[in-house]
Amino acid sequence: MSKSPITCHVLDSTLGKPAANVRVQLEALSPLNSQFHILATGETNSDGRCPDLLVGQSPKDVLVAKGVFKMTFFTGEYFAKAGRATFYPQVEILFQLTETPDAHYHIPLLLSPFSYTTYRGS
């Protein structure tokens, strides 16, 4: 079983703790028709991480060496379960891979009901 080449981590910055059970969807942009297609779906664990989006699949089988990808976090569902309102029902993060397909990419998301921040993690 190989390590997932793309991982994420969601932190609820208003509570100061990991955001568990956030549904996540990873998509790739097709260069042929400029449409996104789903590569994987998952859910953050109790530590707010989704380390196994593409586990068991070789990065070369799943990802191209270069390309545009989209990770969608279904934040409205997360906040609704907690009885909290949010301005952002989904957070979509588009990112571009420019390195070899065996590199690791980590997408952290710092989340609150009315703002979010992301960056290229390690």
What are these language model-derived features?
Residues 102-122:
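Compositionally biased low-complexity segments at domain edges in trafficked proteins
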